[in-house]
């Protein structure tokens, strides 16, 4: 069953909303590829956190004069 923002895996509930949204998106894609749920959650959370950090750094670089 795919996860949603309203019903994410328990381990994603405390992530910031933007990170949780990305993690749910990634986890659902991994599940569609028949990955084990626990592994999909771990990978999706790590990738979503990395994505958020990259986005933050990109915005900061764009804001520099």
Predicted feature descriptions by range:
Residues 1-65:
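C-terminal alpha-helical interaction appendages
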